[in-house]
Amino acid sequence: MSFKSGFVAILGRPNVGKSTFLNHVMGQKIAIMSDKAQTTRNKIMGIYTTDKEQIVFIDTPGIHKPKTALGDFMVESAYSTLREVDTVLFMVPADEKRGKGDDMIMERLKNAKIPVILVINKIDKVHPDQLLEQIDDFRSQMDFKEVVPISALQGNNVPTLISLLTDNLEEGFQYFPEDQITDHPERFLVSEMIREKVLHLTQQEIPHSVAVVIESMKRDQVTDKVHIRATIMVERDSQKGIIIGKQGSMLKKIGQMARRDIELMLGDKVYLETWVKVKKNWRDKKLDLADFGYNQKEY
């Protein structure tokens, strides 16, 4: 039996469910999720492998109109995948009408000269008639290879989408070992899990201004716990105060919630230490962006 493989980008506006879809396909969390826009900042690879195929998904930052150097990085990071993949999944939400952001993305996709599958997510939130209207509207704007309605949260139609991708893959090599599920090191995943808890627990002004740096991560020979030292970076003193909370209560809660997820991922007991530091306007400083891990990565 021949083996098939290929690279697939997941593109769309912020908060359409790209990371939820990837996590569902992989059967575990490799991309953090939040109801805050622009949660995903880096391209994240999810490697789906069976005995018949290997689909390398690339989850991308939500495409938006950037206002900072970080925003520029995120949008360019998303569009750069068009040079690297065999197929694009263009994801839109079933419960929102087509907007200017969708039109902007489609203009780029029309020039990409690679197959584009329209994935309409969140079908569990709409009536079938509304879904049909959405399909007709998008089809009137662009010639898609296929249109697949799904619910990434509930898993509806996700197997159908995987089968469709497999049918369209070329015969090829297995690029990664069958037990590898992502290209990112554990340090990156740990930092993202901490950032996810900050997004979940803090106010609206905080999310875009937060970065997490893992200062050290090593096993303690005495306790056999993985000892992690992490710094949460913000842009203003007021944000630092919010994250620390009254008598350190918010920072403690962030640490407790993050530690549980990190222990599940690593399969080890974890001792997590967190600090908060202010780095003014880091989102507009290229050196700071690079220091915090926001640099272009080609696949």
UniProtKB/Swiss-Prot annotation:
GO cellular component, one term: cytosol
Keywords from the UniProt entry: Cell membrane, Cytoplasm, GTP-binding, Membrane, Nucleotide-binding, Ribosome biogenesis, RNA-binding, rRNA-binding
Cellular localisation: Cytoplasm; Cell membrane
Region span, G5: 150-152
HAMAP family in the record: GTPase_Era (MF_00367)
UniProt protein name: GTPase Era
Species: Streptococcus uberis (strain ATCC BAA-854 / 0140J)
Renumbered residue ranges of the record's region G3: 59-62
One Pfam family from the record: MMR_HSR1
Region (G4): 121-124
Family annotation (InterPro entries): G_ERA_dom, GTP-bd, GTPase_Era-like, KH_dom-like_a/b, KH_dom_type_2, KH_sf_prok-type, P-loop_NTPase, Small_GTP-bd
This protein's encoding gene: era
Subunit architecture: Monomer.
Binding-site positions, GTP: 12-19, 59-63, 121-124
